[in-house]
């Protein structure tokens, strides 16, 4: 989950936009282990990791507490080493969205919305309008990876965050339901939220390709949209 209070040295989105060396350093951490200098692959990985780190604690909070923390760029910072900290996301202020029945609905930091669909869509809108847009614009500008492709990758991470949160907490069906709601936001952060089944468990099939298969000896991911259903089922069965 996200922590409250930003430790010294942690980075917000605007820190990345203000300094190309800082952005490059964080991209290098995000793409550690990727044996390639192809900027389109590295950019895709970076956008995915940044979105995943932000969306995961937010999705878990919506799922478990029916509260959405404010993950706008102005209110959030990330550990410069990303996974180097077990809780790599920090919030500056405790602002949140909640439902009318929440005991803290009257708190000055609370914004009350009608239902959990509104919470899921508020996360989509915050990521789209108040966090990712200038970052994706910047990364697309130097990476030769198209904006639409990067937005698909970001949307996949939003959907995947809800699916994984549901699996991790024993609420798989609810996680899938919220994933579909979150994916129904306005373009460019809009997707199918395709969720197949294998052995009774959800398998999120991405809308966009992460390009991992273009690495030396890189296979298609299990949730790759380029992988046909029979091959996906075979690999899942082999790994069961």
Model regions: which residues?
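Cys/His-clustered metal-coordination modules, chiefly Zn-binding fingers
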Residues: 167-170, 174-240
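Hydrophobic, aromatic-lined core segments that form the binding pocket/scaffold
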Residues: 14-16, 20-200
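A eukaryotic "domain-start" boundary segment
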Residues: 1-21
